[in-house]
């Protein structure tokens, strides 16, 4: 039953309250527009806050602190150790999610942005129908629309996700038992992160990689470091494998691989790909057709093929990062209010991968520079040689700077180790400097606090410059 026969009208309607939707909403409301955000769940934040970035990183942080405690020589001498299960640390993750949700709700309230909870679908080019929790519906119209519905785990045919022992990267957060052995199918960013988390809790892990090496987009040395660290922690990595079938029993999962191998575990996490959340929007009513992955094509202003409909975030594909989605939302607000986005995503977007230890990189890899025949040199710093790492007990890891032999321009930075996603931003800031500002000499000529992890840049710079002749 539709409660309002005449649609409630807004200047702009944003579908989805994740980072992209939030960025667009804040920009548009601050510009004075009458804005509504439609969210299908019962609280704001989107997948990033509720099933993706925030809970998984909270889990990772809790596990890494347990590992750090148990490896600290002081506590080892006193025969003191911590043990926790996946279900126990889920409570910590939920606390963080609740804090994030309350904070983001406050953003909308303070900016007088209308929040509508329900599932939206187009009925014509300027009108959406919203299905409410009580199955009633309401109509809303707008001059402009922003689609920021995000993505969800890909569910291939042949995998029974209704089985109680089969999970995807969303449902794993509702894991109701504590497995002793888990199979993770898919060794991308999500699969590798969860492999680290479960192995850190002492769970036996089989990580099935459909490619020939882990995270092939990374610099080879960093990818190899992750492979070694997972192997050294006891994880079993199987590269170049694809599944033939997944067989479920009452208390286990049997994975059959096309190579003939098979393995049994308490449960399986399928983490191999994502698809855009566009299938329930009735986009044909507005004249749009998503691609096979549920994604929409946009121009430099994030406008789709329909000039009053924009899209941001995972639903448009690369780079599929929460940080980038928020920026895209801001740019859309500019495009709607002024006719053109006043900015664009930077050329070198940093990668942050929250394995244990972390991985982060920005710029070119060694294999890319070699293929392009760029005369580069390498500067390295091992964390085990840094006083701060020795004090903190985080000696596993390294920082690598790639720079041009002749101009000394920084071309790429790659970090493996605790706090890598934070450390990378120092180098990123220098890489973004114009002209002669981007030079490895900066790290030699500046004075760092001591002892700090930032000192790794000075050590790596000196190491690299000493290779020149």
Curated annotation (Swiss-Prot):
Q: Enumerate the cofactors the protein uses.
A: FAD
Q: Identify the residues that bind FAD.
A: 39-48
Keywords of this entry: Cytoplasm, FAD, Flavoprotein, NAD, NADP, Oxidoreductase
Q: What is its EC number?
A: 1.6.1.1
Question: What note does UniProt attach to the cofactor annotation?
Answer: Binds 1 FAD per subunit.
Instruction: Give the UniProt record's GO annotations in the biological process aspect.
Output: 2-oxoglutarate metabolic process; NADP metabolic process
- Top-rank taxon of the source lineage equals Bacteria
Gene Ontology, cellular component aspect: cytosol
Compartment(s) of residence = Cytoplasm
Q: Name one Pfam family in it.
A: Pyr_redox_dim
Q: Which cysteines are joined by disulfide bonds?
A: none
Catalyses: NAD(+) + NADPH = NADH + NADP(+)
Q: Which GO terms describe its molecular function?
A: dihydrolipoyl dehydrogenase (NADH) activity; flavin adenine dinucleotide binding; NAD(P)+ transhydrogenase (Si-specific) activity
Which PANTHER family does this UniProt record tie to the protein? DISULFIDE OXIDOREDUCTASE, SOLUBLE PYRIDINE NUCLEOTIDE TRANSHYDROGENASE
HAMAP family from the UniProt entry = SthA
Family membership, please give it: Belongs to the class-I pyridine nucleotide-disulfide oxidoreductase family.
**Role summary:** Conversion of NADPH, generated by peripheral catabolic pathways, to NADH, which can enter the respiratory chain for energy generation.
Q: What is this protein called?
A: Soluble pyridine nucleotide transhydrogenase
């Amino acid at each position: 039953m539709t409660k309002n026969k005449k649609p409630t009208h807004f200047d702009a309607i944003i579908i989805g309250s994740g980072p992209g939707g939030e960025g667009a909403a804040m920009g548009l409301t601050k510009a004075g527009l009458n804005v509504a955000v439609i969210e299908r769940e019962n609280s704001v934040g989107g997948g990033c806050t509720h099933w993706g970035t925030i809970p998984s990183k909270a889990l990772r942080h809790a596990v890494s602190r347990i590992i750090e405690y148990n490896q600290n020589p002081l506590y080892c001498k006193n025969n003191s150790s911590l043990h926790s299960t996946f279900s126990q640390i889920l409570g910590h993750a939920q606390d963080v999610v609740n804090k994030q949700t309350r904070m983001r709700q406050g953003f909308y309230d303070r900016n007088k942005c209308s929040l509508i909870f329900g599932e939206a679908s187009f009925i014509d080019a300027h009108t959406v129908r919203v299905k409410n929790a009580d199955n009633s519906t309401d109509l809303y119209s707008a001059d402009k629309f922003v689609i920021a519905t995000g993505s969800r785990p890909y569910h291939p045919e042949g995998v029974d996700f209704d089985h109680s022992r089969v999970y995807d990267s969303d449902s794993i957060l509702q894991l109701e038992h504590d497995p002793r052995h888990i199979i993770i199918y898919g060794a991308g960013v999500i699969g590798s992160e969860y492999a680290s988390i479960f192995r850190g809790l002492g769970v036996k892990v089989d990580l099935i990689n459909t490619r020939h090496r882990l995270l092939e987009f990374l610099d080879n040395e960093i990818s190899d470091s992750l492979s070694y660290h997972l192997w050294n922690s006891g994880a079993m990595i199987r590269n170049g494998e694809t599944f033939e079938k997944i067989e479920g029993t009452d208390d286990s999962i049997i994975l059959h691989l096309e190579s003939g191998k098979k393995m049994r575990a308490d449960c399986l996490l399928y983490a191999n790909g994502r698809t855009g959340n566009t299938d329930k929007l009735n986009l044909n009513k507005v004249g749009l057709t998503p691609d096979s992955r549920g994604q929409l094509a946009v121009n430099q202003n994030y406008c789709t093929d329909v000039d009053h409909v924009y899209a941001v975030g995972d639903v448009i594909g690369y780079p599929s990062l929460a940080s980038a989605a928020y920026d895209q939302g801001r740019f859309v607000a500019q495009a709607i209010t002024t006719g053109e986005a006043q900015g664009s995503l930077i050329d070198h977007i940093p990668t942050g991968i929250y394995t244990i230890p972390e991985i982060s990189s920005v710029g070119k890899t060694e294999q890319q520079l070699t293929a392009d025949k760029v005369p580069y040199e390498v500067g390295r710093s091992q964390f085990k040689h840094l006083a701060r790492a020795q004090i903190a007990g985080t000696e596993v890891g390294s920082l690598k700077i790639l720079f041009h032999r002749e101009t000394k321009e920084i071309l790429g930075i790659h970090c493996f180790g605790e706090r890598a996603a934070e450390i990378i931003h120092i180098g990123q800031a220098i890489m973004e400097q114009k002209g002669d500002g981007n030079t490895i000499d900066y790290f030699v000529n500046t004075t760092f606090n001591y002892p700090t992890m930032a000192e790794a840049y000075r050590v790596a710079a000196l190491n690299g410059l000493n290779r020149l002749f």
